[in-house]
Design a protein with these regions (language model features):
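C-terminal beta-signal and adjacent terminal beta-strands/loops
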Residues: 4, 530, 576, 581-582, ...
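A beta-strand signature from Gram-negative outer-membrane beta-barrel systems
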Residues: 36, 137-181
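N-terminal periplasmic "start-of-domain" segments of outer-membrane beta-barrel proteins
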Residues: 37-72, 103, 126, 148
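Extracytoplasmic beta-strand/coil segments of soluble accessory domains associated
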Residues: 78-122
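Short acidic/polar hinge/loop motifs at secondary-structure boundaries
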Residues: 104, 122-150, 170, 264-266, ...
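Short strand-turn segments of transmembrane beta-barrel domains in outer membranes
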Residues: 150, 165-200, 210-222, 679
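Acidic/polar loop-and-plug regions of large Gram-negative outer-membrane beta-barrel proteins
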Residues: 236, 243-321, 348-379, 431-434
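Gram-negative outer-membrane beta-barrel transporters
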Residues: 400, 461-465, 568-570, 575-580, ...
Length: 764
């Protein structure tokens, strides 16, 4: 594979800088080493390495354990990203639990272009069908921190999903003392949550913990409920200066859906048959009586698909990980890891009688054993699969060099089916007749075999005032899909096997951080990335086997920034330019090598983004050390660079990417053991389609919490605490998650209304 001139230039410049600054003539006498530790103190103040990413060559910030534990109980680690600069997080509910209601964008990238890791285990793709979205795999109570790089994660972090952004979730090690914690929460919409964790203590180098959480509540919008059972465990065996760690996660989740709606439905101008409008627009909690549209078929009216029991999701996920860390001599460190994941689940969606009848007639003479539709059809999708992999990393400290190299291997096998079945009496409330299939839509398997390795050298120069990172990674993903990908495959009696390989053997990353003095740093970085095409199964299921597969999306990321660390404040500001090529888009075109026109996914050009991000915290002396402030501000312009088909979108803004994002808060500690926080988050208006003919208004949300009892104990409990969380204090009515379109009105998920939650916890 050829190396671009840009890559050559970046590496040559990096090498030249390294050689020049490493020469004896540049060995300036300096007393400074690294930037001093943060002096600002407080129970909700982060150390500089967390708050502003001190000593990092890229813009890297984190969410502390204290912040995670101050959030509403049960909130997902994904939703917590909304407190970080640049991350536009939208959620269907206050806790971010509903999978199909979550969305994330940062700089030029969306949720599926971000890499996620849990204790250095790569989480693969974030697809709700078949993926491993991070919010299924960890409770906040077990997290130590969440670290995010909005532009470019470290070259040594394994991911085939990331075009630059990386979010890493790090859990706690087991406590060396026997003990535990129990908490119970009640909240709006009949929410109940219990969390319990037991630490076993250390015994001859062995330690461990087990935890469980149980959530049940009603949907805030419409009928139905959510139910989640989640278990985690970790065992650690310290061997000399090394350790072996085993961890496991088990997640069982069930919920009912709520609909996405258009602006017209939201405004009540869409002529809804049931008079629904506003943010409470929901599925029906009853089976209505509707006119018959097909003679003799009682439930033939399409509007019967609005009954809530026809929209269901269920997932079960199991993850096991084993890690071995050990020093080798005085200069080498080895880390080996292995993991295994299994998953299964199903989703239910309705299909109207007329649609089912057409599909049934298309297949009934070809596929034996089909039944004529009786009314509204029960649409069942099932998923199952396994994912397994190994990682290895070796670091070597050699004078001014910190060398590291590693490899990642993974196999991901996934199976999906989709069929339509009759229900008793054809009724929306009838039991599904799984022995009466009406028509078949999917039954395929897909595999992803990944090989990635990296090499990195961190040089410490100028009396350790300058650190330079030089590295690259190689990524190869072999993809295959086979079976019945769509109804056309069933009708044509074909089971195609389609393969595609995406690889790049040289993806460089260059970065530097310079200590101006003991309080200030300048940093800069450049990186290139390649990612598995997002939604690969959908891409290769969209058309006939003759349609060619697309090239992988690729990206470049530039950053330059400054950090300041003072006795009463710290701050970081970064400017960036980000772009990705080979953007994927489905549209009608002639299939190469034929005269047939089909709608299939193609590479259609680039997206570029530029902007700046600020993050800081301040504890003013004149307020007696009892009040401190934090704030993040982001400015981002993300634009399409190329037109596609007949759509002139070059220069148009990418939908769902706000120009301005701001979060800020004030924390007040009036007395020891009491903490009050008031925060706000503002998102500016967003375009909702590619041609920028529609946009949704910006909004501001205010949240607050009160923590009481820090340091208070009684009886067998070392600490007893109470917390109150109020989200969306002013009950802001807004449209949050956007399902973007090309040139038509988009659909939205209204943001959740005001919620209140009370939590009582005890540690022993």
């Amino acid at each position: 594979m050829k190396t671009s001139n840009l890559r050559r230039g970046a590496l040559m410049c990096g090498a030249a800088v390294t050689m020049a600054l490493g020469a004896p003539t540049w060995a300036l006498a300096q007393t400074a080493g690294t930037v001093d530790e943060l002096v600002v103190t407080g129970s909700r103040v982060s150390e500089a390495s967390v708050a502003i990413g001190t000593d990092q060559a890229t813009a890297t910030v984190a969410i502390t354990r204290e912040a995670l534990l101050s959030a509403p109980a049960g909130v997902t680690g994904l939703k917590m990203l909304e407190s970080l600069p640049g991350f536009n997080v939208q959620a269907n509910d206050a806790l971010g639990m509903y999978e199909f209601g979550n969305s994330v964008s940062v700089r030029a990238f969306n949720f599926q272009q971000i890499g996620f890791l849990l204790d250095n285990i790569p989480m693969g793709r974030s697809d709700q069908f078949g993926g491993s979205p991070i919010y299924r795999y960890v409770d906040n109570e077990n997290l130590l921190r969440v670290t995010a790089s909005a532009g470019s994660g470290d070259v040594g972090l394994p991911s085939y999903a990331s075009l630059g952004p990386i979010v890493s979730y790090l859990t706690q090690v087991p406590d060396k003392e026997f003990g535990g914690v129990v908490s119970y929460s009640r909240g709006s919409d009949n929410l109940q949550r219990t969390f319990a964790r037991l630490d076993l203590g250390e015994h001859n180098g062995f330690s461990g913990y087990v935890s469980g959480s149980w959530i049940h509540g009603d949907l805030w919008r419409g009928p139905g409920d959510i139910d989640r059972k989640h278990y985690e465990g970790k065992l650690r065996w310290e061997i000399g200066e090394g350790a072996i760690t085993f961890q496991t996660v088990h997640n069982d989740y069930f919920d009912y859906d709520s609909p996405s709606i258009t602006k017209a439905q939201y405004a009540g101008t869409a002529g809804d048959l049931f008079g629904r409008s506003g943010r409470d627009f929901a599925y029906l909690g009853y089976v209505p009586v509707l006119p018959v549209t097909s003679p003799g078929i009682t439930y033939s009216n399409t509007a019967y698909n609005q009954y809530y029991k026809q929209a269901v999701n269920s997932r079960q996920d199991h993850l096991y990980g084993l890690t071995y860390e050990t020093p080798i001599g005085g200069a080498l460190n080895l880390t080996l890891g292995g993991y295994y994941e299994s998953k299964e689940g199903y989703g239910v969606s309705p299909e109207a009688y007329a649609t089912s009848l057409t599909n049934y007639n298309n297949e009934r003479l070809i596929i034996p054993g089909l039944f004529a539709p009786k009314g509204l059809q029960y649409g069942l999708s099932t998923v199952d699969g396994t994912r397994q992999g190994v990682t290895a990393k070796l670091t070597w400290n050699l004078g001014v060099h910190a060398l590291s190299a590693g490899v990642w291997l993974e196999n991901d096998d996934y199976h999906r089916t989709q069929q339509r079945y009759n229900q008793v009496g054809g009724s929306p409330d009838g039991a599904p007749l799984l022995n009466e299939p009406v028509h078949l839509q999917r039954n395929y398997t897909s595999t992803r075999d990944t090989v990635e390795f990296f090499v990195k050298d961190t040089l410490s120069l100028l009396d350790e005032r300058l650190h330079i990172d030089l590295g690259f990674k190689s990524l190869s993903v072999d993809y295959n899909i086979q079976g019945y990908r769509n109804p056309a495959d069933f009708i044509a009696s074909r089971r195609p096997s389609i393969s595609k390989t995406w690889e790049d053997n040289f993806l460089p990353q260059v970065g530097a951080v310079f200590d101006v003095n003991s309080r200030d740093q300048i940093f800069a970085s450049y990186s290139e990335n390649m990612a598995l095409p997002r939604g690969a199964d959908d891409i290769f299921s969209a058309a006939s086997p003759a349609a060619p597969g697309p090239e992988a999306e690729t990206s470049t990321n530039w950053e330059i920034g400054y950090r300041a660390n003072r006795p009463t404040f710290n701050a970081s500001i970064v400017a960036y330019q980000t772009s990705f090529e080979n953007r994927l888009q489905a549209f009608a075109a002639v299939v190469p090598g034929s005269s047939t026109t089909e709608t299939f996914y193609q590479n259609v050009g680039a997206v570029k983004a530029h902007g700046a991000e600020f993050s800081g915290q301040w504890k003013p002396e004149f307020l007696g050390g009892k009040v401190y402030f934090n704030s993040n501000l982001s400015y981002n312009i993300a634009e399409f660079q190329d037109n596609f088909a007949t759509f002139a979108i070059a220069g148009k803004r990418v939908p769902d990417f706000p120009e301005w994002l701001w979060t800020g808060g004030v924390t007040f500690e009036p007395v020891e053991g009491a903490v009050f926080n008031l925060s706000a988050r503002h998102i500016s208006s967003r375009f909702t389609n590619f041609v920028n003919s529609e946009e949704t208004d910006g909004y501001t949300i205010y949240n607050a919490y009160l923590d009481l009892g820090d340091g208070f104990g009684a009886g067998p409990f070392e600490q007893i605490k109470a917390r109150v969380n109020v989200d969306n204090i002013l009950d802001e009515d807004y449209l949050g998650t956007v399902s973007t379109t090309t040139n038509t009105p988009a659909s939205f998920r209204p943001g959740p209304r005001r919620t209140i939650q009370f939590t009582l916890s005890a540690e022993f």
